[in-house]
Amino acid sequence: MYKFVLSILLVATMGIFAGCTKYKDQKKAVSGFAKVYCDESFKNILEQEISIFEYQYPHSNVMARYMSESAALDSLLNKNVDLIITQKDLTQDQKRYLASKNRAYRSRMIAVDAVALIVNKNSDIDELSMQELTDLMTGKYRTWGKIVPTKLRNDSVKLLFDGNASGVIHYMKEKFLKGKDFSFPVYSAKSTEEVFQLVEKNRNAIGFVGVSWIADDMGESAKSNEERFKQLNKSEQETEPTAIDFTSRVKVLKVRSMDRVQGVKPYQAYIADGSYPLFRKIYAIDAAYPGSPSHQFFVFLTGVIGQKIILQTGVMPGAEPVRIVDVSN
C-alpha cells in the first residue's frame, strides 16, 4: 500500500509575522458577515476552511449554502451573493455581463480536485479503465459482467451521484457524454453522505464523489481548531507532512488511463502528475468589494493557510507549490 506525504513549500517573506500587537489588530480588522455559495461536492473542504477562518478571526462569521453549480453561478450574476466556489471559471459572456454592471471580480483556481469511484467494500471489483467507464456512462453495457470479470456477473449497474445538478455529475457528463444527458436512469442522492450509505447497502452500486469525501486525514479532524491553527501557522521548516489514506467505509477503485497498463487511485501525487484521469479544477470567484468580509474570506482561501487546509483534505492545492514524497510501506 502506498501513502503519499505532501507538504507545502512556502516562500518566506519578510513582515508576515510582525509581532503580537499587529496580529491582534489584524484579528479585529477582519470582521463581519460573509456569505459563500458552493457546490455540494466541495462541502467537506469548505467547512474546514470556515472553521479555521472563524477561529483565526473570531469577529467574523461565514455562512455557506450548498447548491448546484449552475445555481451558484446564477446567484453570483444576479448579485444574490458575491463569492462562490465552482469547478468552472467564468465564461467570456459572464465576464462581460459583470463588467456591464460595473462589478469587478477576481477568479482564482484554489484546488485540483478529483472524482473518486466508490463501490461496496466487499466488492471483487478493483479497477476500471477509461474505456470501461465510457461503456458504463453511455449505457453500452448495463450489467457488471459485461464490463469486468466479477461475481456480480448478471447484476445491473447502479450509478449513484450526489444530486442531478451537482458539479460531479456535470463533470462526468462532459467527460464521457459531451454534456448530454444519460440515456438510462441514474440515481441522484440527496447528499454525498447518502451516496456512501447506498453504496454500503448495494453491492451492485458505484458512486461518484469528490475525493475529499474519501480521504482519511490520519487524525487531523480529531484535533481542536487551536491545535490545527498552530500547525498550519508553522514555518516551512516546521511544517508537518500530511499523510492521506482512504476511508474504510467503501472500496475506492483504481482508474486506468487509455495509455497506461495499470490503474491508480486518486492519491494527491497521481492527481498532481495527471496519472489519475478524473481530475477537475476548482475556482473561487469573488465579486465582493475589497475589504468586505466576503473578500477577506476569498483572500484566506487563496492564501497560505487556506491552501494548507486544502492539502490536508486529499485535494491538490491550486495556488501554492507542493513537494511530493512517495512513502512505501
Give residue spans per PLM region.
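Exported/periplasmic ABC-transporter solute-binding proteins
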Residues: 20-58, 62-70, 74-77, 119-329
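Acidic, polar ligand-binding/catalytic clefts
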Residues: 85-108, 243, 250-251, 257-262, ...
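Short, solvent-exposed loop/turn segments at the edges of secondary structure
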Residues: 110-113, 278-280
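Bacterial N-terminal signal peptides
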Residues: 7-16
